């Protein structure tokens, strides 16, 4: 995709440079020991070890360690390389501020077969050339370690910094700029470790050279990298690119900001890319994997981020804006966790294969076409997804048939996802959509969703609203839409559609039966209800379930739904995400006690006996009178406690759940809230322990006991 500096052109240029160097060298230049490194016009070796370079500057060579120390040197040399190395394994140590101006020649040249060239030291080096390379290791490698180097050249068709066998930059600051060529180039691998690297390529001859290019792998760990390129790739490799823990900015005006035909891996990095041309800002001909960190990629003429193979993004904050797409993959696309904002002129997020979105926050916006588009299977599991399109006659979410015609795509939606869809049309599901637990809102101008839609095993519709708009939407029976048989192209019933589905849980009635469920006759004592469903029940008491002497007192629900309302035998609530037991509880009227006549309910009981409750014993009437008073006294919708645990919870909830002074340590209470309620009630003097270390939460309490305890709590 990108053009790099032609190897043939580069070799020809180097051969000509080498020929010029040889022309100016005397015959003695090839003496082995005395002439190892040339600095300007002076050879350094065993005999001559120090040469003055500029005002107060020195170049000192140690042949034993093969180290050339530059101390505040100024080298102006334009008829061959300013520093020409012939020794294997040379180290150049920088002390103070050093500068090299080599005119039309190479600044530092390490000749063929000299192996590793190392630049290091606490000082700095500034290399400028008019028409040559700044640093070149011929058939060798280059290490820039713990130092500062600036390299710039006005040359065309060459490289500012290059080494044939690989380049490593470690703990250093490197600035490299070129008029038209590669700022950094190696046929080997490029490794940048905890460094601050800045590169630029102006491509003044419009040949499209990359600013940074490796024919091998590029590995960047830590530090910062900023690369800009006019008309070429800003950062590219012929093999793979790995970026870890790095702050990276890469921009191109006519090509890719980042390109590789191999795999691209980005780990815990802050990456910003921009492409103003007609090629993707970030592109891999293979797979892209991004884990953690932040990514912001912009492209005005193509894709913001794309891979021919798979694309996997995990726990990353992504803000992409592209022309064709913000995210593209030819293979499977997986988006897990994190936050993804994707905007594009055409399709916001597009996979030519499957797409899986798991527990991610996704906001996808397309101006012309689809916000989300995939083939095979689109699975949205958990998280929050917003899909919006402004295109005419376009679906916001579209399942595209596979290129080989193997299927028309299908959708799976669940995990409690919140899915919001807006567009001319809502969702084209392909072959079908399977919904588990989800909250789906579709606001369309034409139709909301193409059928068929089914619910996964163990799940069902909890609530459905439909209408021409959100303002006119009303509840409706989902199964009245006559979903089967499916007719291709048949639209959804409503422009505005809101669905809430959930896992089905068991509603079980003990000591009674369901006679009516949500306005329809029902026979049985169990029902499977999806979580989130509004439930209205009419119940019938099974009097035969009570023991001799017991009378019905109240309906008790466990767990107690937050919006529970009880009106006689009619109960309403929203089904929680767990099973619910409804129990008809009865009580044995209390034995006569001396204070029975002193009960505040004594007159009420007598009235009951003299009125509609004729035939009951005095004490039964007394108990029913207490029950009636409790229903009027307790908070609306609260069940009358049947045991000590329920009584403690009633008192504790009414007091706004205060924390007890001591941690509960009951051996017979496993539920944390019940334990706290019991401990608090005992500390408040409203209840007592039953025995050492036990509270006996299941022990029955009479209505009279409930009434007295409730009044004792100043209610």
PLM region descriptions:
Residues 516-549, 575-578:
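Extracellular modular ligand-binding repeats in secreted and cell-surface proteins
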Residues 1-7:
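N-terminal secretory signal peptides that target proteins for export/translocation
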Residues 30-504:
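A composition-driven surface/loop motif
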Residues 25, 29-31, 588-676, 683-704, ...:
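Feature responds to low-complexity, polar/acidic, surface-exposed segments characteristic
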Residues 57, 79-81, 103-109, 131-132, ...:
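Short, recurring structural edge motifs at helix starts
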Residues 458-479, 534-568:
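Surface-exposed interfaces of beta-sheet-rich extracellular modules
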Residues 14-24:
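Bacterial N-terminal signal peptides
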Residues 495-509, 567-596, 677, 709:
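Conserved "repeat-terminator" motif of extracellular CCP/Sushi domains
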């Amino acid at each position: 995709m990108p053009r790099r500096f032609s190897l043939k052109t580069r070799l020809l240029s180097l051969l000509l440079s080498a020929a010029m160097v040889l022309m100016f060298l005397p015959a003695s230049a090839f003496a082995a020991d005395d002439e190892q490194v040339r600095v300007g016009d002076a050879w350094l070796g065993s005999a001559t070890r120090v040469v003055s370079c500029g005002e107060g500057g020195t170049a000192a060579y140690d042949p034993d360690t093969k180290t050339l120390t530059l101390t505040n040197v100024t080298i102006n040399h334009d008829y061959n390389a300013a520093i020409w190395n012939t020794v294997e394994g040379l180290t150049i140590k920088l002390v103070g501020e050093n500068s090299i101006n080599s005119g039309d020649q190479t600044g530092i040249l390490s000749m063929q077969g000299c192996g590793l060239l190392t630049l290091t030291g606490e000082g700095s080096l500034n290399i400028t050339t008019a028409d040559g390379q700044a640093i070149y290791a011929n058939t060798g490698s280059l290490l820039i370690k713990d130092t500062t180097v600036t390299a710039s050249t006005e040359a065309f068709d060459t490289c500012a910094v290059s080494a044939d066998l690989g380049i490593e930059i470690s703990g250093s600051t490197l600035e490299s700029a070129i008029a038209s060529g590669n700022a950094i180039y190696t046929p080997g691998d490029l490794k940048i470790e905890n460094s601050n690297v800045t590169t630029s390529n102006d491509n003044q001859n419009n040949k499209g050279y990359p600013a940074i290019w490796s024919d091998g792998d590029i590995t960047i760990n830590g530090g910062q990298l900023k690369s800009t390129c006019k008309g070429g790739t800003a950062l590219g490799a012929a093999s793979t690119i790995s970026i870890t823990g790095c702050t990276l900015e890469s921009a191109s005006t006519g090509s890719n900001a980042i390109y590789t035909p191999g795999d691209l891996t980005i780990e815990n990095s802050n990456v910003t890319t921009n492409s103003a041309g007609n090629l993707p800002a970030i592109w891999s001909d293979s797979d892209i994997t991004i884990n953690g960190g932040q990514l912001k990629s912009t492209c005005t003429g193509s894709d913001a981020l794309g891979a021919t193979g798979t694309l996997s993004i995990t726990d990353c904050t992504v803000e992409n804006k592209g022309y064709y797409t913000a995210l593209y993959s030819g293979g499977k696309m997986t988006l897990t966790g994190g936050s993804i904002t994707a905007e594009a002129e055409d399709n916001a997020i597009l996979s030519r294969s499957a797409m899986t979105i798991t527990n991610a926050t996704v906001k996808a916006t397309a101006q012309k076409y689809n916000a989300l588009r995939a083939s095979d299977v689109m699975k949205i599991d958990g998280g929050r997804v917003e899909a919006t399109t402004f295109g005419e006659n376009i679906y916001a979410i579209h399942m595209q048939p596979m290129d080989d015609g193997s299927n028309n795509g299908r959708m799976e939606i669940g995990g409690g996802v919140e899915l919001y869809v807006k567009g001319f049309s809502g969702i084209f599901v392909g072959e079908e959509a399977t919904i588990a637990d989800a909250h789906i809102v579709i606001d369309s101008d034409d139709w909301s969703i193409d059928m068929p839609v089914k619910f996964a095993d163990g799940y069902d519709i909890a609530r459905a609203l439909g209408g021409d708009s959100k303002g006119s939407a009303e509840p409706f029976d989902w199964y009245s839409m006559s979903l089967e048989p499916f007719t291709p192209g048949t639209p959804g019933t409503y422009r505005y559609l809101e669905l809430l589905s959930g896992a089905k849980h068991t509603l079980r009635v003990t000591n009674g039966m369901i006679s009516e469920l949500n306005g329809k006759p029902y026979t049985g004592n169990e029902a499977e209800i999806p979580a989130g469903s509004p439930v209205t029940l009419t119940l019938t008491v099974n009097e035969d379930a009570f023991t001799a002497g017991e009378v019905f007192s109240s309906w008790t629900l466990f767990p107690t739904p937050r919006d529970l309302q009880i009106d006689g035998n009619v109960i309403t609530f929203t089904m929680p995400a767990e099973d619910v037991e409804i129990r008809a509880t009865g009580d044995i009227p209390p034995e006569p006690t001396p204070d029975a006549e002193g009960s505040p309910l004594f007159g009420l009981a007598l009235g009951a006996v003299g009125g509609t409750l004729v035939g009951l014993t005095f004490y039964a009437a007394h108990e029913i009178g207490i029950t009636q008073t409790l229903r009027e006294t307790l908070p609306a919708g609260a069940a009358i406690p049947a045991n000590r645990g329920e009584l403690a919870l009633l008192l504790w909830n009414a007091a706004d759940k205060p924390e007890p002074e001591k941690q509960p340590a009951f051996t017979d209470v496993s539920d944390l809230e019940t334990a706290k309620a019991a401990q608090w009630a005992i500390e408040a003097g409203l209840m007592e322990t039953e025995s050492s270390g036990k509270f006996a939460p299941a022990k029955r309490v009479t209505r009279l006991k409930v009434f007295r305890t409730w009044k004792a709590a100043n209610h």
